[in-house]
Amino acid sequence: MVKVGVNGFGRIGRLVTRAAFNSGKVDIVAINDPFIDLHYMVYMFQYDSTHGKFHGTVKAENGKLVINGKAITIFQERDPANIKWGDAGATYVVESTGVFTTMEKAGAHLKGGAKRVIISAPSADAPMFVMGVNHEKYDNSLKIVSNASCTTNCLAPLAKVIHDHFGIVEGLMTTVHAITATQKTVDGPSGKLWRDGRGAAQNIIPASTGAAKAVGKVIPELNGKLTGMAFRVPTPNVSVVDLTCRLEKPAKYDDIKKVVKQASEGPLKGILGYTEDQVVSCDFNSDTHSSTFDAGAGIALNDHFVKLISWYDNEFGYSNRVVDLMVHMASKE
């Protein structure tokens, strides 16, 4: 089983750790976070306002974080180059600070003995992989990869199924996205993105997202055919993608439902879900799929122009894909 270090014990770092313990697919052996001491880590891992209390045991013992009886080495280094991943036995590192997202910056982990780095965010220059879409293109010459964004992980599997069957001529995506840590609780300064600094709990905030364009990186045939934007809304978790696209081949809405349902039960099982229930966002909290197609919410104007709706737990679904990508990479060693 691949031995993993986690850099940055924030929302994604903690939930990747949860996903690892829930699934038993990878072995977390080390965690680095300069801003959270050991006893605070115990507390933050045990209690989660969004996903509830951890079902298991968590304690501090002999300077280590012990989860379900497993001792995890703790580092508190600010510079990734100084983290001794090798000493802790970690061969893969999940880079989940949100800070070191380029090949050069994430590459610092290799100095401490890590063999590979998985960036849990989009990257300007690291190759991006989306499970179920282009993960087969991974080869073990790559030392640093990106798991793309939560929104790209929601959109890409759906876009792939639609494009494979009907062809996407062009499309626009909107994600109605839950609050994340980069937003402000009340109005505050926010660099160049003035709107992003407005109070998260009070507003619907139009924002930019590279998620749709990134689909063109993981599905090259769609490069230049998709773009999109986001609305940040005052909910703590779970987001929804609205993909409005023009189809090459004519398709009845029922035809679209059929192919998505087949994909959800076949090649994309566990990644792309399908529901005909009258669901709302809360129903997907702690859901492990990358994307769940909402058959009842979509609409068709005609056989060539459709609006498709897909839900995602932007925290937990994504964190589970980080684990799955590491398992896939390990299978190629």
UniProtKB/Swiss-Prot annotation:
EC numbers: 1.2.1.12, 2.6.99.-
Active site: 150 (nucleophile)
Modified residues (S-nitrosocysteine): 150, 245
Modified-residue entries (S-(2-succinyl)cysteine), positions: 150, 245
PTM comment text: ISGylated.
Modified positions (Phosphotyrosine) in chain numbering: 40
GO molecular function, one term: aspartic-type endopeptidase inhibitor activity
One Pfam family cited in the UniProt record for this chain: Gp_dh_N
Annotated site location: Activates thiol group during catalysis: 177
ADP-ribosylcysteine: residues bearing it: 150
Residues carrying N6-malonyllysine: 192, 213
Positions of modified residues (N6,N6-dimethyllysine): 3, 64, 192, 213, 225, 258, 261, 332
PROSITE patterns according to UniProt: GAPDH
Alphabetically ordered keywords of this record: Acetylation, ADP-ribosylation, Apoptosis, Cytoplasm, Cytoskeleton, Glycolysis, Immunity, Innate immunity, Isopeptide bond, Methylation, NAD, Nucleus, Oxidoreductase, Phosphoprotein, S-nitrosylation, Transferase, Translation regulation, Ubl conjugation
Region (Interaction with WARS1): 2-146
Modified residues (Deamidated asparagine): 7, 62, 68, 147, 153, 223, 314
Residues reported in the UniProt entry to bind D-glyceraldehyde 3-phosphate: 149-151, 180, 209-210, 232
Modification sites for Phosphothreonine: 73, 151, 175, 180, 182, 209, 227, 235
Residues recorded as bearing Phosphoserine in the entry: 120, 146, 149, 239, 310, 331
Protein name, UniProt field: Glyceraldehyde-3-phosphate dehydrogenase
Source species of the chain: Sus scrofa
